[in-house]
Amino acid sequence: MEIRQIVYPGEKIDLEGQKPRNGLYEENDEYYSEYFGVVQKSDKFIDIVPFNGPYMPRINDKVIGKVIDVSATMWTVDINSPYFSLMHMNDTPWHVTSGDLRKYLNVGDYIYAKVSILNEIKESWLSLKDVNLRKLEEGSIIYIKAPKVPRVIGKAGNMINMIKSETNTKIIVGQNGLIWIDGEPENVDLAINAIGMVEKEAHTFGLTDRVKAYLDKMKGGNNGRSEVNQ
């Protein structure tokens, strides 16, 4: 099992012709790592993926959140961040009137939403006005560490698309580390275990092939129950 390059905060990063993106800072025309994590390279970009850390919202991030409060005109949503988010009734596809918000979303409901506004004190506002954004019905919600989300999605979506195809499940990955999975119970369990494997081994090479081999093996025998908390 080959390990990706591990770097420490302040460690100089050789870009090798690629463009810096996330987790790097510039000083005197050189680039350095912001985090203790691993180097992740794509065709054009280089990122530092931290091993740990809270989710910090960014404009246009698509996240999964849980409604924790309902007022006359807006919902308060937990998006797995140090700061709660708000969503105004006008930022939904429904014709909502003040005072009847619980007819549409109540405490405990989950949504797949977009971060539409982010202010200087990290307050964020969500919107459901975009393609595929909606209230999440049925299914299971699991949690992974937010820094591992890019690895679960994979390059051009190859990892998560493979897991969906091999397990015959519907999966939505929020950039905040919450994941919605729907399908037959045994298939959902298999998808959860595969995602847990990706999270655990995110710092290694050849992971897509190993996860595929694991799924092939499990589908050929008796599936085990999930080892990841739902």
UniProtKB/Swiss-Prot annotation:
SUPFAM superfamilies: Eukaryotic type KH-domain (KH-domain type I) (SSF54791), Nucleic acid-binding proteins (SSF50249), Ribosomal L27 protein-like (SSF110324)
Location of the S1 motif domain: 60-129
InterPro entries registered for this protein in UniProt: Exosome_RNA_bind1/RRP40/RRP4, KH_dom, KH_dom_type_1, KH_dom_type_1_sf, NA-bd_OB-fold, Rrp4, RRP4_S1
Residue stretches making up the KH domain: 137-195
Subcellular location: Cytoplasm
Cytoplasm among keywords: yes
GO BP terms: CUT catabolic process; exonucleolytic trimming to generate mature 3'-end of 5.8S rRNA from tricistronic rRNA transcript (SSU-rRNA, 5.8S rRNA, LSU-rRNA); poly(A)-dependent snoRNA 3'-end processing; RNA catabolic process; U4 snRNA 3'-end processing
Entry keyword annotation includes Protein biosynthesis: no
Highest taxon above the source species: Archaea
One Gene Ontology term of the molecular function aspect: poly(A) binding
GO cellular component: cytoplasm; exosome (RNase complex)
Keywords carried by this UniProt record: Cytoplasm, Exosome, RNA-binding
Function: Non-catalytic component of the exosome, which is a complex involved in RNA degradation. Increases the RNA binding and the efficiency of RNA degradation. Confers strong poly(A) specificity to the exosome.
HAMAP family: Exosome_Rrp4
Membership in a protein family: Belongs to the RRP4 family.
Self-association and partners: Component of the archaeal exosome complex. Forms a trimer of Rrp4 and/or Csl4 subunits. The trimer associates with a hexameric ring-like arrangement composed of 3 Rrp41-Rrp42 heterodimers.
Listed name of the protein: Exosome complex component Rrp4
